[in-house]
Amino acid sequence: MTKYIFVTGGVVSSIGKGITAASLGRLLKNRGLSVTIQKFDPYINVDPGTMSPYQHGEVYVTDDGAETDLDLGHYERFIDINLNKYSNVTTGKVYSEVIKKERRGDYLGGTVQVIPHITNELKDRVFRAARMTNSDIIITEIGGTVGDIESLPFLEAIRQIKSDVGAENVLYIHTTLIPYIKAAGEMKTKPTQHSVKELRSLGIQPNIIVVRTEQPVSQEMKDKIALFCDIKASEVIESRDEETLYNVPLSLQKQKMDDIVLEHLQLEAPQAEMTDWKNLVHRVKNLSKKVRIGLVGKYVSLQDAYLSVAEALRHAGYEHDAEIEIDWIDSEKVTKENVAEIMKDVDGILVPGGFGDRAIEGKIAAIEYARVNKVPYFGICLGMQLATVEFARNVLGLEGAHSAEIEPETKHNIIDLLPEQKNIENMGGTLRLGLYPARIKQGTKAEAAYGTTLVEERHRHRYEFNNEYREQMEEAGMIVSATSPDGRLVEVVELADHPWFVACQYHPEFISRPNRPQSLFKDFVGAALNNK
């Protein structure tokens, strides 16, 4: 029988529900239990694929091509599992499915309502994930904050699941904030009490309360929370700001959170063996070197827009015993005139993925600087496309060369639409998405990084390198070092006469893990260290 854990949040959003859920998942997996995890998002968008990164942070792509919430990245990195489209559920998806069923006549003329039709569809998404994975435990994080109008159907659905499967098979975790009032020198539990009161008014009694705090939580304060929220003091778990996120599972284990969970769910399992994880955290806290990477993008004011890229850089740094210092460089402020001054202190330059024409020339200026000055360069998706545009302009001398996405009327469309994309009208869910194979050319930097000639990586793009320019590029020194297995699509390019200049069409950041860094990131950071 699958057991169900639901993680809710109160007081404020962005409180760390995702990290809590992922960390608990890691502990339970290390106790020998099979775990899957999903995120419920109350927004009406079908997925975050067309949302601005300023609204929602990065869009995380799964193997099967789902465009999902960035929390799925935390889940995959912490638990080391590959999730799928059933791991992210939105109000938009649920309402679309219910309306489709109504139009088909599935409800036999009945009045379609939030209860039971929307709540039943939500419950089915939980039970479907359990059936598909046959996991011992499924953890479901509910996005938003208790009290939000949008969250009410989700909370009602998870309340009903307790009756559907039995109280011994369901556990509720509520994460809240204990603010520190600096002027008074006090921490306040009242917001937590009110948040739990709101949750209980909806029929959900939390079994565990995780309190986010800057300061240590005293036993007296835990006793007070336990008294007013009707749980044991041992079930109040402190979650303080950590030097590294990867210490959170160890902090939860120290407070016996996994023991409490298993006791509630009437499960027996051996203690979690966390030696490898402890070694990872020790390594992260004791890095002996530093390397500075210039990340050039247009969304740098919200670093969550590049969350997986930043994490993949850090993973690579751990492998090299190096702390990664990221210079968040706004590409809108980069010009040919100031690029040398902006880049003077960086050891490597990375241009990540993106869409649209804003701040493109700043990225191209950064790429030219990296190429000319032999600074290690790593381009991802748009960063690969612009590397070929820069090369076409400044090495091949093709004046006005550009991407058809940015300049549809360009004479030299170095980057153009995939043929199968030309008649597509909808933006959402129509990109080339998910895991695809790539064949790597022997004797290249890409092969040296991977140590093999066939890899699989996750993609998210609509435009592709135009093969009409391939021969010219290669003759001038830009090597096509990986393609799709049929040779049709260019996947990786690199420069022959450069210490390390590699750019890929796919998104390698999505498969990086803290204890298993992605190969191109690892070699890029190594090259940046050699450039110090």
Swiss-Prot record:
It catalyses: UTP + L-glutamine + ATP + H2O = CTP + L-glutamate + ADP + phosphate + 2 H(+); L-glutamine + H2O = L-glutamate + NH4(+); UTP + NH4(+) + ATP = CTP + ADP + phosphate + 2 H(+). L-glutamine binds at residues 54, 354, 382-385, 405, 462. One of its GO terms (cellular component) is cytosol. Gene3D superfamilies: 3.40.50.880, P-loop containing nucleotide triphosphate hydrolases (3.40.50.300). The active site is at residues 381, 507, 509. Pathway: Pyrimidine metabolism; CTP biosynthesis via de novo pathway; CTP from UDP: step 2/2. Belongs to the CTP synthase family. This is CTP synthase. It comes from Listeria innocua serovar 6a (strain ATCC BAA-680 / CLIP 11262). The gene is pyrG.
